C-alpha cells in the first residue's frame, strides 16, 4: 500500500538543529532544491551549458529566446541567456586579366576580418544580423562586404560587432600587373580579433593564392583553367584571373555569422 509523507520542515539529526523550511510552491520543470547557507530552501534553475548553434549565411534578425532563428528559420533555444558570436566578413574578389592576348593578370582579393565575442543577452530582445555575399570577380573585382551584429530592440546593453571585408584585387593596365588586394584590418569590437590576409599581385604565377581568412582558405588555379576557381570556406579572397581567355577573376568568399547559445 502506498503511503504519503507530508512535511513543512526538514531537520538534520545529531548536534545542533537547523530548521530547513520547504518552499510553499511546487517546482517548475528542470528546477532543483537550493539551500542559501542559512537554512532557507528554494527552487532554482539548473546550471548553464551549451544549448545549440544558430547559423546565419545571409542577413536577418536574431530574436532572443526564439526557436525560428538562423537562415534556416528553425534554430534557437527558449532558454538562451548568453552567447558566443563568431563573425566573419567577406573576402574581396579577384580582378580579371588585361584583355585578349594579354599576359598581364589582375590582383587577387584580400581576406575578410574575423572576431569571436562573448555577450550576455540580459534585457536584449532582438539583434540585426548583416552577412555579406561573396563579391564577383571582374575588371576590377568588387570589395568584400562587412559583417555585423547590432542591437535592434531591448533595454539591455549590446555593443555593435563589426568585421570589415577584404579589398578587391586591382585590374592590370596595358603594361603592368594588377595590384594586390589588401586584407581587412584587425577588428576592434570582439574579444578575439583577426584581420584578413593579403592577396598577391598579378603575375606571381600559379603558386599564388588569394588572401586567407580565419574561416577560409586562399585559392589557387591549376594549369589550363580560364576562370578563377570558387573560394574555399568563408571570407577568403578571390583568386586573380588566369592568363587564358576569358581570364575572369574569382569571386570572394561570402561571410557567415555563428551564434553559440548558452543557458
Label the model's feature ranges.
Residues 31, 81-83:
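Short beta-strand/loop motifs in extracellular/secreted proteins, especially
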Amino acid at each position: 500500500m502506498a503511503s504519503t509523507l507530508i512535511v513543512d520542515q526538514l531537520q538534520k539529526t545529531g548536534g545542533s538543529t537547523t530548521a530547513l523550511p520547504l518552499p510553499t510552491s511546487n517546482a517548475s520543470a528542470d528546477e532543483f532544491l537550493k539551500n542559501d547557507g542559512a537554512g532557507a530552501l528554494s527552487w532554482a534553475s539548473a546550471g548553464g551549458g551549451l544549448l545549440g548553434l544558430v547559423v546565419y549565411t545571409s542577413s536577418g534578425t536574431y530574436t532572443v529566446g526564439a526557436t525560428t532563428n538562423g537562415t534556416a528559420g528553425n534554430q534557437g533555444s527558449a532558454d538562451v541567456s548568453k552567447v558566443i558570436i563568431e563573425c566573419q566578413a567577406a573576402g574581396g574578389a579577384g580582378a580579371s586579366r588585361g584583355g585578349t592576348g594579354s599576359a598581364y593578370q589582375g590582383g587577387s582579393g584580400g581576406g575578410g576580418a574575423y572576431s569571436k565575442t562573448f555577450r550576455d543577452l540580459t534585457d536584449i530582445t532582438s539583434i540585426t544580423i548583416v552577412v555579406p555575399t561573396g563579391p564577383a570577380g571582374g575588371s576590377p573585382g568588387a570589395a568584400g562586404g562587412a559583417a555585423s551584429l547590432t542591437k535592434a530592440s531591448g533595454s539591455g546593453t549590446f555593443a555593435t560587432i563589426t568585421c570589415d571585408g577584404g579589398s578587391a584585387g586591382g585590374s592590370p593596365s596595358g603594361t603592368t600587373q594588377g595590384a594586390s588586394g589588401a586584407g581587412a584590418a584587425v577588428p576592434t569590437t570582439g574579444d578575439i580579433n583577426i584581420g584578413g590576409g593579403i592577396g598577391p599581385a598579378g603575375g606571381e604565377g600559379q603558386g599564388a593564392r588569394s588572401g586567407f581568412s580565419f574561416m577560409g582558405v586562399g585559392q589557387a588555379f591549376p594549369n589550363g583553367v580560364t576562370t578563377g576557381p570558387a573560394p574555399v570556406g568563408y571570407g577568403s579572397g578571390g583568386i586573380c584571373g588566369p592568363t587564358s581567355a576569358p581570364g575572369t577573376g574569382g569571386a570572394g568568399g561570402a561571410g557567415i555569422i555563428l551564434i553559440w547559445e548558452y543557458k
